[in-house]
């Protein structure tokens, strides 16, 4: 009686696909595929880990498990569920001797996953600053953080400060032009008000027939010149008249002094009468002299009247 020996397991270093190719059970399971009307098996699914596509360790000739469709796996669990369920299906379809090769392949996959850098999720700028994932606050050119000497927004070359706190730095700009225009307008308005006030005061001094007659600035100036000339001429006339009156008074004073000297002289009748009794001869002499002077004055006064009558 001879006993059939079971087929020897393939060496560990061989590919599991080769082992599955020599496995009779795998051949038995793959026979129904050819009886399905010649349909090709679906393509092998791929896993996306850290942006790199990797093939699942599923054998190419073997179809997916009948109880778990591929579409249902993708819709329910995503890529990670697909990998775990595929590993379970492969364990059912793989021969017992293929487990060490699967363990070595899983170790290589884990090593490759660890070598790739972890992907950081994208966060908004505010949350990144809160969790210290963005740029540190000390390096940002702000006036509230960091050292005062490391300001990048306001350089020391652009900021100029005067030593005196009362002096203001003026630069040529639109704001400065507006300030200058306002100052010029106010100064011109103040000057015009002063000129108008001076003309109003001058108008009050000029006499006109209607006292409230309105005059232009040119008329006010012309009338003022005429009025000034009239007042100057009037003053000159008054001075000349005063000089003439002074001369007349001086002449009359000289005549009165002569009369007093004549009366006070010792040869006059007044002096002799003071010394002794008045004689009738002296009285007659004085009377004759007074009559002769009076007649002479009357003769001078009548002559102009007669001359005017003859004309």
From Swiss-Prot:
Pfam families, per the entry = HLH
The intrachain disulfides are: none
A single GO molecular function term of this UniProt record:
DNA-binding transcription factor activity, RNA polymerase II-specific
Regarding how it is modified after translation, the entry says: Phosphorylated on serine residues.
List, alphabetically, the GO terms of the cellular component aspect.
Answer: nucleus
SUPFAM superfamilies in the record: HLH, helix-loop-helix DNA-binding domain
Disordered: annotated segments: 1-67, 265-311
Q: Which GO terms describe its biological process?
A: cell differentiation; regulation of transcription by RNA polymerase II
Report the residue ranges that make up the bHLH domain in this protein. Answer: 179-231
Which residue stretches does the UniProt record annotate as biased composition, category Pro residues?
Answer: 1-14
| UniProt KW keywords | Developmental protein, Differentiation, DNA-binding, Nucleus, Phosphoprotein, Transcription, Transcription regulation
Q: According to its UniProt record, where is this protein located?
A: Nucleus
Q: Which InterPro entries match?
A: bHLH_dom (IPR011598), HLH_DNA-bd_sf (IPR036638), TAL-like (IPR040238)
SMART domains reported in the protein's UniProt record: HLH
Give residue spans, biased composition: Basic and acidic residues: 15-25, 284-294
Describe its assembly.
Answer: Efficient DNA binding requires dimerization with another bHLH protein. Forms heterodimers with TCF3.
Q: What this chain does, per the record?
A: Implicated in the genesis of hemopoietic malignancies. It may play an important role in hemopoietic differentiation.
- What protein name does the entry list? T-cell acute lymphocytic leukemia protein 1 homolog
């Amino acid at each position: 009686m001879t006993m059939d020996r079971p087929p020897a397991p393939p060496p560990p270093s061989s590919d599991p696909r080769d082992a599955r190719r020599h496995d009779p059970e795998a051949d038995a399971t793959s026979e129904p595929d050819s009886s399905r009307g010649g349909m090709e098996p679906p393509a092998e699914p791929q896993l996306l880990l850290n942006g790199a596509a990797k093939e699942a360790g599923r054998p190419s000739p073997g179809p997916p498990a009948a109880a778990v469709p591929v579409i249902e796996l993708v819709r329910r669990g995503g890529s990670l569920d697909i990998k775990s369920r595929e590993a379970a299906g492969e364990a059912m379809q793989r021969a017992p001797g293929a487990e060490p090769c699967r363990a070595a392949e899983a170790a290589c996959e884990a090593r490759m996953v660890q070598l790739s850098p972890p992907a950081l999720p994208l966060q908004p700028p505010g949350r990144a600053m809160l969790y210290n994932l963005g740029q540190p606050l000390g390096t940002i050119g702000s006036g509230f953080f960091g050292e005062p000497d490391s300001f990048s927004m306001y350089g020391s070359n652009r900021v100029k400060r005067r030593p005196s706190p009362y002096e203001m730095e003026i630069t040529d700009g639109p704001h400065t032009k507006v300030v200058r225009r306002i100052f010029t307008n106010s100064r011109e308005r103040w000057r015009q008000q002063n000129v108008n006030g001076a003309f109003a005061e001058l108008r009050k001094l000029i006499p006109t027939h209607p006292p409230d007659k309105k005059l232009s600035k040119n008329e006010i100036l012309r009338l003022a010149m005429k009025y000034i000339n009239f007042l100057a001429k009037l003053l000159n006339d008054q001075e000349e008249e005063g000089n003439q009156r002074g001369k007349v008074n001086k002449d009359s004073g000289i005549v009165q002094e002569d009369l007093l000297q004549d009366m006070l002289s010792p040869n006059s009748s007044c002096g002799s009468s003071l010394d002794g009794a008045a004689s009738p001869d002296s009285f007659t002499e004085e009377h004759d002299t007074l009559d002769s002077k009076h007649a002479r004055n009357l003769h001078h006064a009548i002559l102009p009247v007669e001359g005017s009558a003859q004309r």
